[in-house]
């Protein structure tokens, strides 16, 4: 289910007060559960991160993400990997980005620079259970391109391995063993919490 709540509707104005009646909108969308076998690795394309500064607030103002994902699509990639003006990687267009180097899991720390995704939180819990060292630090694109493995997560895609970023293969370009293990554990946890989802994709 996808839920959206707005302050309400009034005559066009940039000002607001406490007299609005909130508008609540929700819809459901049927999704097939992920198959056990890891999917083929996807490609990412780097794009400038042009979003506003409060990315931790989940809003419907997604123009920056739409433009990034469209640019990635036109470049033949599955998803965008957004780069801040200082050269650091922030996150993917509509997913959280992780990479593995020397069996350490890297992910950008929680701040106003990224969306605090629920799937991201769950993946960190799974990684802790696997006794992986977690590095919640900022990092550059050069660090990412030298990674052993990489993957993206979101509620709609679960865990997808990343095999290439721009023209650079990540690791050997295949599904890394740590990624496969984390994905399997994540799906097991999801099935335990949602046991009545029989279909696979």
What are the functions of these language-model segments?
Residues 1-5:
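ATP-grasp fold ATP-binding core
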Residues 6, 11-201:
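Helix-start/capping segments and mature chain N-termini
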């Amino acid at each position: 289910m996808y839920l959206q709540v707005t302050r309400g509707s009034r005559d066009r104005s940039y000002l607001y007060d406490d007299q609005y009646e909130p508008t609540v909108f929700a819809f459901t969308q049927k999704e097939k559960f992920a198959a056990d076998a890891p999917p083929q690795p996807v490609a990412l394309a780097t794009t400038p991160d042009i979003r506003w500064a409060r990315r931790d607030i989940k809003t419907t103002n997604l123009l920056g993400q739409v433009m990034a994902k469209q640019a990635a699509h036109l470049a033949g990639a599955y998803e965008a990997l957004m780069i801040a003006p200082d050269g650091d990687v922030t996150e993917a267009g509509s997913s959280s980005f992780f990479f593995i180097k020397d069996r350490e899991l890297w992910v950008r720390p929680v701040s106003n620079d990224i969306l605090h995704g629920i799937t991201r939180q769950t993946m960190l819990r799974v990684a802790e259970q696997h006794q992986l060292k977690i590095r919640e630090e900022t990092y550059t694109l050069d660090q990412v391109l030298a990674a052993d493995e990489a993957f993206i997560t979101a509620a709609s895609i679960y865990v997808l391995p990343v095999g290439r970023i721009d023209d650079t293969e990540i690791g050997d370009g295949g599904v890394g063993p740590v990624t496969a293990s984390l994905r399997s554990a994540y799906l097991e946890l999801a099935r335990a919490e949602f046991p009545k989802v029989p279909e696979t994709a």
